[in-house]
């Protein structure tokens, strides 16, 4: 399973690891994914979503425009 949030579609960010002598090496900054249990359609579903999506879910519902472009597979 790839490290992508299914609600916000966030992916990893490509950055540099910079040493004291300013040598730069490529590295990836991964999304902060957490397992979250959500009650949808009269059943509990466990999703691995980003912490940004968890904060948004606390303030809005899944029916919101925010998640209209999300790739929710079988919800």
Swiss-Prot record:
Plastid in keyword set: yes
Give a GO cellular-component term.
ribonucleoprotein complex
* MF-aspect GO terms: structural constituent of ribosome
InterPro entries referenced in this protein's UniProt entry, alphabetically: Bacterial_rp_bL28, Ribosomal_bL28, Ribosomal_bL28/bL31-like_sf, Ribosomal_bL28_bact-type, Ribosomal_bL28_sf
Keyword Oxidoreductase annotated: no
GO biological process entries: translation
| Subcellular location field | Plastid, Chloroplast
User: What's in the keyword line of the UniProt record?
Assistant: Chloroplast, Plastid, Ribonucleoprotein, Ribosomal protein
Query: Principal place where this protein is found?
Result: plastid
**What family classification does the UniProt entry report for this protein?**
Belongs to the bacterial ribosomal protein bL28 family.
- What NCBIfam families does the entry give? L28
Q: What is this protein called?
A: Large ribosomal subunit protein bL28c
Write the lineage as a comma-separated list: Eukaryota, Rhodophyta, Bangiophyceae, Cyanidiales, Cyanidiaceae
């Amino acid at each position: 399973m790839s490290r992508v949030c299914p609600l916000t579609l966030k992916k990893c960010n490509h950055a540099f690891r910079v040493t004291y002598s300013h040598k730069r090496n490529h590295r990836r900054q991964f999304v902060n994914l957490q397992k979250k249990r959500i009650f949808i359609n009269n059943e509990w579903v466990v999703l691995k979503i980003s912490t940004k999506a968890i904060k948004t879910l606390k303030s809005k519902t899944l029916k919101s425009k925010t998640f209209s472009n999300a790739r929710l597979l079988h919800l």
